[in-house]
Amino acid sequence: MTRKAVVLYSGGLDSTTCLAIARAEGFEPHAMSFSYGQRHSVELELAKRNARPAGAVEHMVVEFDLRKVGGSALTADIAVPKEGVGDDIPVTYVPARNTIFLSFALGWAEVLGAFDIFIGVNALDYSGYPDCRPEYISAFETMANLATRVGVEGTGRFRIHAPLMRLTKAEIIRKGLALGVDYGLTHSCYDPSPAGVACGLCDSCRLRLKGFAEVGVADPVPYVTGGQGLGGGKETP
């Protein structure tokens, strides 16, 4: 019998690869996306359009507004840094975001009778977010099995899958291409233009472009003028 899995799916490069991996491993993917007041909502629109073509049997979009909390360049009137990937936790970190996302995924998984949750976090080519580290994922998995009926009654055990955790961005892209992922249908930019074109300069764009450059293929999504500085991509006037 095919096992069900909840896949956190933003419409970005990592989560789209994660969805493809879940399918390849024989799971029936139920994709979950979030509209939380993020400034890069073009990513969510792509998720809505592409979840089922990407292999999800069901796609749920959960809506809430983290702009009421603020504290991040993605949800408040704070400039998105464009100087490069730094060593400190950047202002694009959204407080407790992955904890919120995984909690919703856990609730849905329990209702679906699914014991597997996939999340596309990465601890190598990443911006330094604390909720993308392996120790965080391990801790959440422990909590999931302490805080649910399934876990307490012992009728099953939840597992949080983070298959991209120890891969470079280039390795993620290679894996996705091997699985047939169309990266032209993904979006990663934190600060896209009003037309939804990626800036090419934020942390997320830089890491993405670096990955494609290391793979030796062009990033199929367009970038605004000057957004090609790390290789790959196609500029638009």
Swiss-Prot record:
Record family assignment: Belongs to the QueC family.
Tree of life domain: Bacteria
EC class: ligase
SUPFAM superfamilies assigned: Adenine nucleotide alpha hydrolases-like
Reaction equation(s) it catalyzes: 7-carboxy-7-deazaguanine + NH4(+) + ATP = 7-cyano-7-deazaguanine + ADP + phosphate + H2O + H(+)
Cofactor: Zn(2+)
Cystine bridges: none
Protein name: 7-cyano-7-deazaguanine synthase
Keywords: ATP-binding, Ligase, Metal-binding, Nucleotide-binding, Queuosine biosynthesis, Zinc
Key word Mitochondrion present: no
Originating species: Geobacter sulfurreducens (strain ATCC 51573 / DSM 12127 / PCA)
Record note on cofactor: Binds 1 zinc ion per subunit.
GO molecular function, one term: ligase activity, forming carbon-nitrogen bonds
Enzyme Commission code(s) on record: 6.3.4.20
Matching InterPro entries: QueC, Rossmann-like_a/b/a_fold
Gene3D superfamilies in the cross-refs: HUPs
Annotated metabolic or biological route of this protein: Purine metabolism; 7-cyano-7-deazaguanine biosynthesis
Chain sites annotated for binding Zn(2+): 189, 199, 202, 205
Entry-linked Pfam families: QueC
One BP term from GO: queuosine biosynthetic process
PANTHER family: 7-CYANO-7-DEAZAGUANINE SYNTHASE (PTHR42914:SF1)
